[in-house]
Amino acid sequence: MTAAIIGISLGLLIILIFSIFKHFDKKIIYGLILSGIGFLYVGFAWTDLLAVVINSIQAVLFFLMAYYGIKKNIHFLIAGYFLHGLWDISYHFFQNSNLIPPNYDLFCISIDFIFGFYLLLLVYRYKNMFQA
């Protein structure tokens, strides 16, 4: 439970920081975060070849979702965060799921869903702000 509280708190803190500094492009910031979190799993799994391959594939997929979210449509970013949350949930069904740190899944799910809902809120609140 502590991991989820830390994840929610950190997610809200990041949102607050980038809301204060309005000159940052939100699509780029949240796209960079999405692309980075996919590659964290590759770092966790480097000791197992099959896990590295699986995690590299998911990292590239989330990188592409981030890219298309920045360049084409923010809905790719929103979908990417929710899908990454589902990835966090499903990761325990893979062999060698113990390669990720304890409670990292709860921490990451919390941040993923906070960012996903925040971006969804922004899209529907400021429809013209996120046109490609």
Predicted features along the sequence, with ranges:
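Hydrophobic cores of alpha-helical transmembrane segments in multi-pass inner/ER membrane proteins
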Residues: 10-13, 61-64, 110-122
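Hydrophobic, membrane-inserted alpha-helices
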Residues: 12-15, 35-42, 57-65
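Cytoplasmic-side transmembrane-helix entry/capping segments in multi-pass membrane proteins
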Residues: 27-36, 54-58, 77-83
